Design a protein with these regions (language model features):
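Structural signature of nuclease core domains in nucleic-acid processing machines
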Residues: 1-305
């Protein structure tokens, strides 16, 4: 396919500069590696792609936009999902949302706690509500995954063994995210998930305990409520005209101001004229779920898979 692309889309390829041909060749190798890894993952899974570039809202959206109403204000969120994988089981379609990332984007519960990094969750929970009209089955949210789509560069010893190199590559390319912790679902996602997971963001102890990026069905249900609550809060703030300069801050290298396109117009100065940094604290998983339970009025209740 790449040879056909070169023939049809890049006339005079052989006359291009050596730098162009080198960079294109490197990009080609990276793309082929990504496709190979994706094929390897799907070969070990009962989850199969059911949609690509699935749109929410807009003129070409397959599903409606995510809409929140607050008084006379309406918030409409549209976008696209890179890929949706599904597993049909007992008359229900388990769906996971997959997003390709060329950088080192990670799924961080601390971000979600403060209303950041919730895009994939928005799509997942919208699929839960609206997906039956598209796919024909009741939808069960099964998780969100960031799929590495980048050139892999490792720092290793020169004489590293092929086996050790493979393990290092697997660690680097493991998916990041959150998945439904039901053992049957995990095994459907990756056949060896309960023994030696290679792709999923989970760890399995010697006694079979599962940890890492997992959540119960009850936790995902509460998380969906919390995300919707966040959207209502955002809508109210927009309706009230809130334009406070209070950027998120975790440190000098992790500030919303670092790469802000509007810095020259904002002139933010912490502590001056009402400007203030909004420090974000790291939260552990148990702290996060306790907070979500409190915010959704579910404290003291316990759900099963």
């Amino acid at each position: 396919y790449i040879d056909l692309y070169i023939r049809d889309e890049i006339p005079g390829y052989e006359e291009k500069s050596a730098r162009f041909r080198y960079l294109f060749g490197r990009l080609r190798t990276t793309a082929e590696d990504i496709v190979d890894r994706m094929a390897e993952e799907l070969a070990e899974s009962d989850f199969k792609p059911v949609a690509f570039e699935l749109g929410f809202g807009g003129r070409d959206g397959t599903l409606p936009a995510i809409t929140i109403q607050e008084g006379d204000a309406t918030l409409s969120v549209s976008g696209k999902v890179d890929r949706v994988d599904g597993w049909l089981h007992d008359g229900k379609l388990y769906l996971r949302v997959v997003d390709y990332k060329t950088g080192r984007k990670s799924f961080d519960l601390s971000d979600v706690r403060y209303g950041l990094g919730i895009q994939m969750l928005l799509y997942l929970f919208t699929l839960e509500k609206e997906g039956q009209s598209c796919f024909g089955y009741p939808i069960v949210p099964a998780g969100v995954l960031y799929h590495p789509a980048r050139d892999l560069i490792l720092k290793t010893e020169r004489d590293i063994s092929p086996e050790a190199l493979r393990k290092a590559m697997d660690r680097e390319l493991r998916r990041d995210g959150m998945v439904l912790g039901d053992p049957e679902v995990l095994r459907a996602m990756e056949h060896s998930a309960l023994e030696a997971p290679c792709f999923l963001p989970i760890q399995v102890s010697k006694d079979g305990g599962i940890s890492g990026g997992v959540a119960t069905a009850a936790q995902l249900g509460r998380l969906g409520q919390y995300v919707e609550k966040l959207l209502h809060q955002i809508t109210r703030q927009l309706r009230q005209g809130n334009i406070d300069a209070d950027p998120c801050w975790r440190g000098p290298q992790e500030s919303a101001c670092t790469y802000c396109d509007f810095a020259s117009a904002c002139h933010f100065q912490d502590g001056q004229a009402g400007d203030r940094l909004r420090p974000l604290k790291r939260v552990k998983a148990d702290e996060f779920w306790e907070f979500v339970a409190h915010e959704t009025g579910e404290e003291g209740r316990h759900g099963e898979f």
